[in-house]
């Protein structure tokens, strides 16, 4: 047992986190997509890398080698006219996600705007090329078809709503084409084009997070567990 976190004078161990995952119904063989906001949990008791590795170890302890772990590693590269380098483009999605994508055996999707880092038994299902960020063969489509699980770890924000918006062709968004240079894991550069279902700026369409949370909370598939902060 390893204590890795403290909040309000109470220390939390890796066993505590593993138990919390089990209480949520996470199990061996699961496909698990995780959005993270670690700063909400408390004060780390370990060095940066050991702290992050402890959390990753807890995920894999529960889902096992039969499971698959997915984390968003968004870069918005083509939106900023930047090259998307699958190995070197840093993610804007937090310290754990950036740490995870650099680990041995982790693979990254080709999406130059909304990429994901993936490791596990079914990783190849999620590595197909896509022509639209939230369209056919995107991570969220495969996650849905494979009955995967979606976790917000430390916060409530996520991009799953964007997938639903594109599937239902909402009136306040439209397809915008982005093009640029992608450098793959073999350091080979090539041109890529992708569609992103962006928001129409002349229409007020900010999502009502409270309503979304309430709708999700009322489904039989939603579970919540308080851990540390």
What is the role of each PLM region?
Residues 1-229:
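N-terminal and secondary-structure boundary signal
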């Amino acid at each position: 047992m390893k204590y890795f976190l403290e909040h309000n004078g109470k220390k939390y161990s890796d066993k505590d986190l593993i138990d919390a995952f089990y209480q949520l119904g996470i199990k061996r063989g699961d496909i698990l997509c995780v959005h993270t906001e670690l700063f909400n949990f408390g004060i780390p008791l370990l060095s940066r890398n050991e702290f992050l590795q402890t959390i990753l170890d807890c995920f894999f302890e529960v889902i096992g080698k039969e499971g698959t772990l997915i984390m968003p590693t968004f870069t918005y590269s083509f939106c900023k006219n930047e090259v998307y380098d699958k190995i070197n483009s840093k993610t804007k999605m937090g310290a754990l996600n950036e740490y995870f994508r650099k680990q041995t055996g982790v693979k990254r999707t080709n999406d130059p705007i909304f990429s994901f880092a993936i490791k596990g038994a079914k990783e190849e299902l999620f590595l197909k090329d896509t022509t639209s960020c939230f369209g056919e063969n995107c991570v969220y489509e495969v996650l849905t078809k494979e009955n995967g699980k979606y976790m917000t770890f430390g916060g409530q924000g996520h991009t799953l709503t964007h997938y639903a918006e594109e599937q239902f062709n909402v009136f306040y968004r439209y397809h915008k084409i982005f093009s640029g240079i992608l450098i793959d894991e073999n350091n080979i550069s090539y041109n890529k084009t992708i569609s992103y279902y962006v928001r129409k700026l002349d229409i007020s369409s900010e999502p009502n997070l409270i309503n979304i949370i309430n709708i999700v909370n009322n489904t039989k598939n939603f579970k919540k567990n308080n851990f540390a902060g």
